[in-house]
Amino acid sequence: MLAAQLDSYLADMQMTATPKQKQQLLDFVAMLAKWNKAYNLTSVRDPEQMLIRHIMDSLAASPHLVGERFIDVGTGPGLPGIPLAIMNPDKEFVLLDSLGKRIRFQKQVQFELAIGNISSVESRVEAYQPEEKFDGVLSRAFASIQDMLQWCHHLPKPTGCFYALKGQLSDEEMANMPEGFTLTDVFELKVPRLDEQRHLLRVVKAA
């Protein structure tokens, strides 16, 4: 049932996936549903809704990512980082979260699904100092783009971008970019079977 739905959703989004990638996405949903009962990783309980609200919602950002090295800040159980890593095996993803139970889940997913292009880090974002900066800083965890830029300003390369996955947009929020940052793109995302506004904001540090 879920496999057929995944095929349909990928087709709707004009995405192609190998049989291995499809199985990894489905296995990730199964692990999330199983671990969620004990670890309370997400408020979404139904696997069909997990597929829509977590997997497809994460993948909607995929066509807009530029670069090879990304960090997913406040990733929780690995969202959007793990679905994006599965579908972009040529890119590297660091998954950052401050809660140990979420990191344990991510590492188990990495082990069981043999995902070679993710690494999990347990840290608060302001305390994390990577040896190498990132092409893209991703998050769907922050309430406002201002918060994201304040907490994550030290993470991208000079040529890197911030990617914020958002729902409904506030004109005030978009107009009030912190000093030193420029909003370059607002992408309207279409997620199958999700009748809600979804957007991806791309922000760069001003030169």
UniProtKB/Swiss-Prot annotation:
An example GO CC term for this entry is: cytosol
Keyword list (alphabetical) reads:
Cytoplasm, Methyltransferase, rRNA processing, S-adenosyl-L-methionine, Transferase
> What InterPro entries does the annotation carry?
rRNA_ssu_MeTfrase_G (IPR003682), SAM-dependent_MTases_sf (IPR029063)
EC number(s): the record gives 2.1.1.170
The catalysed reaction is: guanosine(527) in 16S rRNA + S-adenosyl-L-methionine = N(7)-methylguanosine(527) in 16S rRNA + S-adenosyl-L-homocysteine
Q: Which residues bind S-adenosyl-L-methionine?
A: G74, L79, V125, E126, R140
| Top-level taxonomic group | Bacteria
Q: Looking at the keywords, is Metal-binding present?
A: no
Quote the PANTHER family the UniProt record gives.
S-ADENOSYL-L-METHIONINE-DEPENDENT METHYLTRANSFERASES SUPERFAMILY PROTEIN
Function recorded in the entry: Specifically methylates the N7 position of guanine in position 527 of 16S rRNA.
- Protein family per UniProt: Belongs to the methyltransferase superfamily. RNA methyltransferase RsmG family.
What's the protein name? Ribosomal RNA small subunit methyltransferase G
Q: Which organism is it from?
A: Shewanella loihica (strain ATCC BAA-1088 / PV-4)
The primary gene name is rsmG
